[in-house]
Amino acid sequence: IGFIGGIIEEKIKSFGFKPISNLTGHKITTGLLHAGIDVPNIKTDDPYEFREGEIYAIEPFATTGSGFVSDIDQVEIFSLYSFNTVKMRQSRQILNQIISERGLLPFSERWLNKKFPSRLTISVALKEMLREQIIRAYPVLKDSGDGLVSQTEHTILITDKGNEVLTK
């Protein structure tokens, strides 16, 4: 995998940009978007080799800035962390919707706004779920050097002949 990161890094640099070193692609398994194996955007010494049948999101991140991102105080993406319950009835309705439609996959407050008309109810429910550690919050990321960031993604299946691009 470290070799693949080197190829991604070279390609990004050939266009005059910097790869973002602390963001990666990742292995995907059924119901689990980030399955524990990262695909770097820079060359590393990681000796792991792709195996037939595995699925990966290859996600080159490029920037005009520093090549490193950090969190800002804004959250737009969440994911289910535990199957505990909440006290408020509206929070339970929202939690049940998340479980039935998203499971462990990430979701956004914007997605909930399409399902539930009250932004205040959604905000209170999300705060309750965060406090009870039922969901995780993912802060928005920003280039540390204030550069512009781009990202693209292809999902690939590793086959006996190489790979098959699943996103087209």
Predicted regions and their residues:
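Active-site neighborhoods and metal-handling regions in enzymes and metal-associated proteins
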Residues: 1-168
